[in-house]
């Protein structure tokens, strides 16, 4: 298969590229000027366009993962602007380019996030649940809506509403490993807030699965089937490392580091129902923390 990918140098993107290439698929990477290069790279500007779309012709699938890191610092007005534009305008730019191809891809799989549901500690949300009212939920709603041109061009479009992707090599887990290894890790706030997570290998498998499953379209919740709280994760990681986890991080400290708005998202969350993905035949390798924990503390 010929596959187009944005965000190919990111945490999830690089793992997905490796998996696809290992199985013999051709991956064409859309990269920014000054970014990664190579014979498989096509330059684009997410905010303005793709100068040469000929390399996209004849693709079977598109994986769209590009976007400004949401939790990498306080949500200042400038960062909010970059986060929103990188997702909304970037998605609209890509969808427009795909819609104008003579030979269009069958499917476009877009990253989205659990943040679309806002904060709701009661019950598990499904893909039909209403979106939240906070700023992050608004970003996710506009992010998904920006792919309308692809849908209008009869490209099957899937939005992967992901929880936190876990692997020691990157993402949130890499950031917290050192304090946990030093015995300084602990729950965030009360620790009772929902924490929707998925291991990196399951995320890669799920993206590939939905691209190959014609019956799946629209939003798809993506996290481990087991409902977990922050304290559940904290205990599992401490056990994996053989270290105590008795030093909680107070809410005030999180607010001082990240600002009130981002802190509210960190200290909140939702449980997600993944019945749509399970009913379509997907099998998780790490459906719960007990099975994922050996990986959590790997070097």
Predicted regions and their residues:
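NAD(P)H-binding glycine-rich loop region in Rossmannoid oxidoreductase-like domains
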Residues: 35-90
């Amino acid at each position: 298969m010929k596959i187009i990918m944005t965000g190919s140098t990111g945490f999830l993107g690089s793992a997905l590229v490796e998996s696809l290439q290992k199985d013999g698929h051709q991956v064409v990477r859309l990269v920014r000027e000054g970014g990664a290069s190579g014979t498989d790279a096509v330059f684009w500007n997410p905010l303005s366009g793709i100068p040469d779309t000929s390399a996209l012709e004849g693709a079977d699938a598109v994986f769209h993962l590009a976007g400004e890191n949401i939790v990498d610092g306080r949500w200042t007005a400038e960062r909010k602007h970059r986060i929103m534009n990188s997702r909304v305008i970037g998605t609209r730019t890509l969808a427009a380019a795909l819609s104008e191809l003579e030979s269009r891809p069958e499917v476009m799989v877009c990253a989205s996030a659990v943040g679309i549901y806002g904060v709701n500690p009661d019950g598990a949300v499904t893909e039909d649940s209403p979106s939240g009212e906070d700023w992050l939920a608004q970003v996710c709603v506009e992010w998904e809506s920006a792919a309308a041109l692809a849908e209008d061009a009869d490209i099957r479009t899937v939005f992967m509403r992901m929880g936190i992707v876990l692997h020691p090599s990157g993402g949130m887990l890499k950031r917290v490993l050192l304090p946990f290894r030093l015995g300084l890790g602990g729950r965030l706030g009360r620790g009772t807030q929902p924490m929707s997570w998925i291991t990196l290998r399951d995320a890669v498998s799920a993206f590939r699965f939905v691209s190959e499953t014609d019956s799946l379209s629209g939003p798809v919740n993506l996290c481990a089937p087991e409902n977990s709280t922050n304290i559940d994760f904290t205990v599992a990681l401490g056990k994996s490392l053989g270290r105590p986890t008795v030093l909680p991080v107070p809410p005030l400290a999180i607010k001082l580091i990240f600002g009130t708005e981002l802190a509210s998202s960190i200290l909140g969350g939702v449980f997600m129902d993944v019945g749509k993905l399970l009913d379509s035949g997907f099998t998780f390798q790490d459906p719960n923390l007990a099975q994922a924990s050996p990986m959590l503390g790997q070097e």
